[in-house]
Amino acid sequence: MTGGAAVGSSGRKPWRHGDACVIAHFRLTPKSSKDAVEGVTDTGDGPAFQTRVRAVPENGAANTALEELVASWLGVPKRSVSLIAGGKSRLKSLRIAGEATLLDQKLQMKVDEFQR
């Protein structure tokens, strides 16, 4: 895991702008001892936020926990965060609805915090 890099080894950020949203990529570890976004990691398919949740990966519980964690982490309403890919995979893509430029700034600030 890259504790502070804003980009993976490919030189890309773990998010991109969409239509009135940002699409962010996460590598999820369920059944963890805590709920946390811990940094940026290179997954081989590109960079992703390394994320842990306490929820188990059954009946969508870990996916729901990830959506709630990301909403809280970014300070956005829960309804603005939705899983769009990776329902049964560790690699997830979330759509975060809102002003893409503002969300980009929030995500970059969070990545910068990993460097401290």
Descriptions of predicted regions:
Residues 71:
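The alpha-helix within a helix-turn-helix
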Residues 1-59, 63-68, 78, 82-88, ...:
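Contiguous, often N-terminal, cationic amphipathic patches that form binding interfaces
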